[in-house]
């Protein structure tokens, strides 16, 4: 039988910033094991040969105000592959300049890395080029998408006199996190329709026990 559960206030997940070269290199290394030089070479190919991404050697994570009117054309250019749905949704609404990604003072020689207005022919990319291109497109669309809002849940359940506790995340609005679906869908994420009702009895599906040991904290 479920006991009273607590519901935390809605958390608004902070949207990540657009990529500069250093940040892109770090994330490509973490995700794919690419060296900084390898990522730069791939970026150079996507910039010079395919012409689908902007200049890579930048230390800015912002765009200039005069680029606002070009954003929809850039979205159209990457409206294919796994981002077709997200791009289509963005194209149906007005794209307004926001200080989250527009700041003339934080752009010196070159702005953040984003898609160009050149349509991307995904079949012409190598496997590594596709990985880097997808990273940039996902970040670009995420920055322009709606915020992600979730609610933290804490549930207590009594089974044969033993009290069990569980915590989970109830996603209220997926927003930009839809572009990172694999990272969003974890075992601790539940849908609103699956939230247990207070006081209601539920059948036990399976019971499993996980054994483990605790480790002492590090010396430093």
Regions found by a protein language model. Name each.
Residues 14-28, 53-58, 216-220:
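Short acidic, hydrophobic short linear motifs in intrinsically disordered regions
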